[in-house]
């Protein structure tokens, strides 16, 4: 069952200006060390950060909170599987919120899709509750 859906659109040029103006202070407030390392290795640094920004916004919407109620930017982070597929990792209050909205007997799965077409970066997040597998008899 679908528990939440969120989407967000971020402007890459605006992200580039924000990074130039606020630099490390902004990066450290919003992005995890893993996200920063990923972005700084990429040719399109601002685009990488913009996609992750959009993912955090979309995830907060899918959680039904937006960025309020104690949620922190770094409670939501984007990592990549070896295949390159992006995945959301939730910690802190975001993880608590996810647990509270997941029905008993289910596990939550957070799906994320990222895309960009300069100057736009977009993220789409779907939170799904899957029934837990019954233990083997």
Curated annotation (Swiss-Prot):
Coiled coil: none annotated. Pfam families: ACPS (PF01648). GO terms for cellular component: cytoplasm. Its EC number is 2.7.8.7. Its cofactor is Mg(2+). Mg(2+) binds at residues 8, 57. It is found in: Cytoplasm. Keywords: Cytoplasm, Fatty acid biosynthesis, Fatty acid metabolism, Lipid biosynthesis, Lipid metabolism, Magnesium, Metal-binding, Transferase. This is Holo-[acyl-carrier-protein] synthase. It comes from Cereibacter sphaeroides (strain ATCC 17029 / ATH 2.4.9) (Rhodobacter sphaeroides). Belongs to the P-Pant transferase superfamily. AcpS family. GO terms for biological process: fatty acid biosynthetic process. It is an enzyme of class 2 (transferase). It comes from the Bacteria. It catalyses: apo-[ACP] + CoA = holo-[ACP] + adenosine 3',5'-bisphosphate + H(+). Its main location: cytoplasm.
